[in-house]
From Swiss-Prot:
<dbReference type="InterPro" id="IPR012328">
    <property type="entry name" value="Chalcone/stilbene_synt_C"/>
</dbReference>
<dbReference type="InterPro" id="IPR011141">
    <property type="entry name" value="Polyketide_synthase_type-III"/>
</dbReference>
<feature type="active site">
    <location>
        <position position="167"/>
    </location>
</feature>
<keyword id="KW-0012">Acyltransferase</keyword>
<dbReference type="GO" id="GO:0030639">
    <property type="term" value="P:polyketide biosynthetic process"/>
</dbReference>
<dbReference type="InterPro" id="IPR001099">
    <property type="entry name" value="Chalcone/stilbene_synt_N"/>
</dbReference>
<dbReference type="InterPro" id="IPR016039">
    <property type="entry name" value="Thiolase-like"/>
</dbReference>
<dbReference type="GO" id="GO:0016210">
    <property type="term" value="F:naringenin-chalcone synthase activity"/>
</dbReference>
<dbReference type="Pfam" id="PF02797">
    <property type="entry name" value="Chal_sti_synt_C"/>
</dbReference>
<comment type="similarity">
    <text>Belongs to the thiolase-like superfamily. Chalcone/stilbene synthases family.</text>
</comment>
<comment type="pathway">
    <text>Secondary metabolite biosynthesis; flavonoid biosynthesis.</text>
</comment>
<keyword id="KW-0284">Flavonoid biosynthesis</keyword>
<dbReference type="GO" id="GO:0009813">
    <property type="term" value="P:flavonoid biosynthetic process"/>
</dbReference>
<protein>
    <recommendedName>
        <fullName>Chalcone synthase A</fullName>
        <ecNumber>2.3.1.74</ecNumber>
    </recommendedName>
</protein>
<dbReference type="Pfam" id="PF00195">
    <property type="entry name" value="Chal_sti_synt_N"/>
</dbReference>
<dbReference type="InterPro" id="IPR018088">
    <property type="entry name" value="Chalcone/stilbene_synthase_AS"/>
</dbReference>
<comment type="function">
    <text>The primary product of this enzyme is 4,2',4',6'-tetrahydroxychalcone (also termed naringenin-chalcone or chalcone) which can under specific conditions spontaneously isomerize into naringenin.</text>
</comment>
Amino acid sequence: MSTILTNTWTRREKRIEGHAKILAIGTAIPANWVDQTTYPDFYFRITNSEHLLEHKEKFRRICNKSKIRKRHLVITEELLKKNPNLCTYNEASLNTRQDILVSEVPKLGKEAAMKAIKEWGRPISEITHLVFCTSSGVDMPGADFQLAKLLGLSSSVNRLMMYQQGCNAGAAMLRLAKDLAENNKGGRVLVVCSEVMLNVFRGPSLEQEDYLLAQCLFGDGSAAVIVGTEPRPGLETPLFELVSAAQTTIPDTDSHLKLHLREMGLTFHCSKAVPSLITQNVEDYLVKAFEPFGISDWNSIFWILHPGGIAILDRVEEKLGLEPEKLRASRDVLSESGNLTSAC
């Protein structure tokens, strides 16, 4: 049940001054992991596709060029053998996937949330808002409700569930948390992004070769932050200040990157033009974002670029003339975990 009360005077009284700040960060990954160099052998064996020799060699080349060393996955050989419908390309398997995801996504989210809460050092009862995001499965009550139960949050915590936001979701959740914190005096917002990319795992397709990229790129993981304003001296330690947050969309590009929920799971299509589309537009958008602050030297700022893939990182670095260390954090995440969608 949600209750909305409108009082303009009270609203003005409670609006606080100052920017929202990140007060704690937590991350988590599954214990199970796969070596990228041997993953093509595992993938084609477990999907009964070893006869597709040309496809396998193409996949091996994609993996070798990915600059990913390993990925952590909820998927195990045992799980796939128990559920062979996950290993074909287009067999109806949504029920199987959903049954696994509705449990695993909140559980992985809890691990990151508990680490953030521990770092924060305050009682969990002081959490006023919970924002949960995932592109892995859809359910009601949602993963936010399940996580609130796992954490033992108060039943009066204000919850918001965001499904199917994809790779832009991590930054979008920070933008949302900033708005919530800056409009709720004393509020402490727990943001959790948890991704288990079981929904995109399936066997190879001779007709849909770009799907091999999804099998090479995505990993499982979760991230959590606690956001609030006016940190209490001696009780809370601000890590980062959220000065400004904005979103933009490159026009006429919706056909280049698409994921659709179907009976076979979450389908994936990514055109080869995506890295070029990003690099052709990134500087114009950076100018608009940083001009109000008098910043035009891209090497003078701290970078956390979503590790969407090595081609994106390389081309953005080249386009903006960034020094190698500027994207080191993004490259490290890509190497050690892969693309974690909203969680990185």
